[in-house]
């Protein structure tokens, strides 16, 4: 194991995202936003969980960085694998870094009414 990252977030913080499209587009890709629309009643929990996942990955990668890289949270996309579990799809400089370092990323997300939490493990 190389590194870990964890983030917990109050789900309530993301209610404003539903009313503010620009705010949502600042942190989430178009693909993620489309997937949220399919969620139905659990959109806010899903938003919070995916945001926590992105923050967890940053926390896990930061100790491994040997140089500064430019990224936005939109460069970290949280998608579903064929098995149905959440996984990362990275873009731009953060993707290049992960490839260069030969990193394997493991992600778990959980949410329960008030809170969402994500845990990331990084290995190579």
Swiss-Prot record:
This is Holo-[acyl-carrier-protein] synthase. Its cofactor is Mg(2+). GO terms for molecular function: holo-[acyl-carrier-protein] synthase activity; magnesium ion binding. GO terms for cellular component: cytoplasm. It is found in: Cytoplasm. Its EC number is 2.7.8.7. Keywords: Cytoplasm, Fatty acid biosynthesis, Fatty acid metabolism, Lipid biosynthesis, Lipid metabolism, Magnesium, Metal-binding, Transferase. It is an enzyme of class 2 (transferase). InterPro entries: 4-PPantetheinyl_Trfase_dom, 4-PPantetheinyl_Trfase_dom_sf, ACPS, Ppantetheine-prot_Trfase_dom. It comes from Borreliella afzelii (strain PKo). Disulfide bonds: none annotated.
